[in-house]
Amino acid sequence: TDQQATDELLGRLTTQRLKAGPGAYSVYSNDCFTLAELVVEAVSGQDLMDYVRERFLLPAGLEDTYAPGDAFDTSRLTKTYFSASDDRALPQDTVGIVGAGGLYATAEDLAAFGGLFCGENELLTDASWTSTGEELYAQGLWPADSRDDALAYGLGWDNVHMFPFGQSGIAAWVKGGDTLRYHAGLIVLPEAGKAVAVLSSGGLSTY
């Protein structure tokens, strides 16, 4: 993790006040994931990636997921370009804040991760499974008619009733992520036992 980035975040937070009490309403912020990273490291005494690998990746058999600082074959990373008319590859796209999404993974690993939310496994308790799909977006300030909104937060999810699945009563949990050049979309249908992941070097995670 980029220590300078986390230090700057903590420095900014020392001069700010909460806009509302914790849990009063639901918002998305990468800073929250970075803070979660720091909490995990402080409580566990481990680097976040070591903790994630030990507690999640290895038990789940996910062997193709890496942090930027890991030793892996970077030539496997998809090359990116400024435009279709310029064949010069850009430098490796890297996010140094691991908690905010600075991971590399194959689509297979990402889909398998989504599969952890489909059915019973040893990594998620029933309580954790239930809480991750709760409609947290409905807490506090949120339009009453929001069933088809692109954002409808769950615990860590961008949307927990994605259109058009929600219209048919099918639970659909969605998470997208973007760096400057890489984009990822994960859709999980927990009750149907299905997960799909799409990775790209163009477009956005939302389309």
Language-model segments: which ranges?
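Short, gly/Ser/Thr-rich active-site loops of penicillin-recognizing serine hydrolases
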Residues: G169-I170, V198-Y207
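Short, surface-exposed loop or secondary-structure junction motifs
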Residues: T1-L180, A184-G185
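Short, well-ordered beta-strand elements
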Residues: K175, H183-L189, G193-G202
